[in-house]
Amino acid sequence: MSLDPATVRRIARLARIGIDESDLHALQGELNGILGWIEQLNEVDIDGVEPMVGTGHAALRMREDVVTDGAARDAVLSNAPDAAGPFYTVPKVVE
C-alpha cells in the first residue's frame, strides 16, 4: 500500500498536525516506510502461536512523583482549532 500526497494531507488534518508543502514528500516517504514494515509483519507465519493478552509479569520502574507546570501551554494551544485565552474552545454538545 502506498499513500498519495492527498491522503497524507488528510491524515495530517485529521491528526491536527500542520505540515508545510515542502515537508509533504518527506512525511509521505516516512508513512509509506511504516506501512511497508506493517506489510512485512503481515507476512510472518504465526500458525500455532498462542495469542498474547499482556506481558503479565512486567513491572514499571517507579519514579519520584514531581509536580511541574508542564511549561508547554502555548505549544499545546497552538494545535487547537480554536482557543479562548489559555483554554480550548469546543462546540456545545449538550443543550
Swiss-Prot record:
Residue ranges the record marks as coiled coil: none
Stretch forming the signal peptide: none
Family matches, as Pfam families: GatC
MF term (GO), any: glutaminyl-tRNA synthase (glutamine-hydrolyzing) activity
Catalytic activity from the UniProt record: L-glutamyl-tRNA(Gln) + L-glutamine + ATP + H2O = L-glutaminyl-tRNA(Gln) + L-glutamate + ADP + phosphate + H(+); L-aspartyl-tRNA(Asn) + L-glutamine + ATP + H2O = L-asparaginyl-tRNA(Asn) + L-glutamate + ADP + phosphate + 2 H(+)
E.C. numbers: 6.3.5.-
Keywords assigned: ATP-binding, Ligase, Nucleotide-binding, Protein biosynthesis
Keyword Ligase: yes
InterPro entries documented for this protein: Asp/Glu-ADT_sf_sub_c, GatC
Disulfide partners: none
Record carries keyword Membrane: no
Enzyme class of the recorded protein, top EC level: ligase
A single BP term in Gene Ontology: translation
HAMAP family: GatC
Record text on subunit structure and interactions: Heterotrimer of A, B and C subunits.
Record function comment: Allows the formation of correctly charged Asn-tRNA(Asn) or Gln-tRNA(Gln) through the transamidation of misacylated Asp-tRNA(Asn) or Glu-tRNA(Gln) in organisms which lack either or both of asparaginyl-tRNA or glutaminyl-tRNA synthetases. The reaction takes place in the presence of glutamine and ATP through an activated phospho-Asp-tRNA(Asn) or phospho-Glu-tRNA(Gln).
Assigned protein family: Belongs to the GatC family.
Name of the protein in question: Aspartyl/glutamyl-tRNA(Asn/Gln) amidotransferase subunit C
Biological source species: Gluconacetobacter diazotrophicus (strain ATCC 49037 / DSM 5601 / CCUG 37298 / CIP 103539 / LMG 7603 / PAl5)
